[in-house]
């Protein structure tokens, strides 16, 4: 019987990780390197490139690390040119870059909206356009994984353009899965919910951050965990494990779909496990209401 590593068939492949030096992207890079994948990564945070590159090299992998802003077309093109020059194959692409700052749509400037679209959808199109010829050149097929969000699948007040851009990425991914199926190039999205990270904290409105500053870290964590059925937020490694699956031959017949790595929040659809015995309901009941308002 073959081992799971043999069935995954990742050893010796090459991956490009867009936004691969910090946060979730770093976890993805290290997970792939740990599975025997040579990695090419770019990141706007140039100071994070060296430690991530060094850590991956210590695992015995070949590493290309490039400082680049993926939302700048010329920098993304230069990165892929470097990938093609360094490696004779490309098997896996992971588009991690994304992000937003919470704001009501009517308060956002056209420039802010355009930035949200480019950061969460526009560069993904360009990345796929650059990656496909390199994958085709190898003739082995490949896997492209685009990070999205639960907000691509529900209304998200305060994140209108972000949610719309991620939804566009989702349907673009589905469509390209159909177009590229004949090349055995699989495309899927990975949709997390809230993940503890510097980027997610920066996305919060300043006034909300100010209010939260007076609340204990334990209380903040409890409030974040309350609406997740598994009662915990994911680690970046949890998301990286989802990437490993989609990148590997274990998912050889999986394409055009979304893997929700969210602890069950998509399934819960707004039902929250309220405290004080109210259990799973979309609104608080007597146990919580009495403690909030009967004073």
Mark where each language-model region is.
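Canonical Rossmann dinucleotide-binding motif of NAD(H)/NADP(H)-dependent dehydrogenases/reductases
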Residues: 7-40
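Substrate-binding pocket helix/loop in short-chain dehydrogenase/reductase
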Residues: 104-117, 224
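Active-site loop immediately N-terminal to the catalytic Tyr-X3-Lys motif
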Residues: 106, 154-160, 182, 231, ...
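C-terminal substrate-recognition "lid" of short-chain dehydrogenase/reductases
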Residues: 125, 230-261, 266
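Active-site helix of classical SDR
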Residues: 128, 165, 173
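Alpha-helical segment proximal to the catalytic Tyr-Lys
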Residues: 133, 178-182, 252
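Residue(s) in the substrate-gating loop at a strand-loop-helix junction
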Residues: 149
């Amino acid at each position: 019987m073959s081992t799971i590593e043999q069935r995954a068939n990742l050893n010796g492949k090459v991956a490009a990780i867009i936004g691969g030096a910090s946060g979730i992207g770093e976890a993805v890079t290290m997970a792939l390197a740990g599975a025997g994948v040579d990695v090419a990564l770019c990141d706007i945070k140039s100071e994070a490139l060296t430690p991530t590159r060094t850590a991956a090299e210590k695992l015995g992998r070949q590493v290309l690390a490039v400082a680049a802003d993926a939302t700048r077309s010329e920098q993304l093109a230069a990165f892929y040119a470097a990938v093609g020059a360094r490696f004779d194959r490309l098997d896996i692409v992971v588009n991690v870059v994304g992000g937003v700052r919470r704001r009501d749509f009517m308060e956002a400037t056209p420039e802010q909206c355009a930035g949200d679209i480019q950061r969460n959808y526009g560069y993904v199109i360009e990345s796929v356009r650059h990656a496909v010829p390199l994958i085709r050149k190898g003739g082995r097929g490949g896997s492209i994984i685009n990070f999205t969000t639960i907000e691509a699948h529900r209304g998200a007040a305060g994140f209108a353009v972000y949610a719309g851009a991620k939804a566009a990425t989702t349907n673009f991914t589905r469509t390209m899965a159909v177009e590229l199926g004949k090349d055995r190039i699989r495309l899927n999205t990975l949709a997390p919910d809230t993940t503890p990270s510097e980027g997610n904290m920066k996305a919060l409105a300043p006034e909300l951050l100010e209010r939260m500053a007076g609340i204990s870290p334990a209380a903040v964590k409890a409030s974040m965990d309350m609406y997740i059925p598994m009662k915990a937020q994911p680690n970046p490694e949890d998301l990286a494990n989802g990437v490993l699956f989609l990148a590997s031959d274990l998912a050889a017949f999986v394409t055009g779909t979304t893997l929700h790595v969210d602890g069950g929040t998509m399934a819960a659809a707004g039902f929250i496990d309220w405290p004080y015995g109210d259990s799973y309901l979309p609104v608080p009941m007597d146990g919580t209401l009495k403690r909030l308002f009967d004073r």
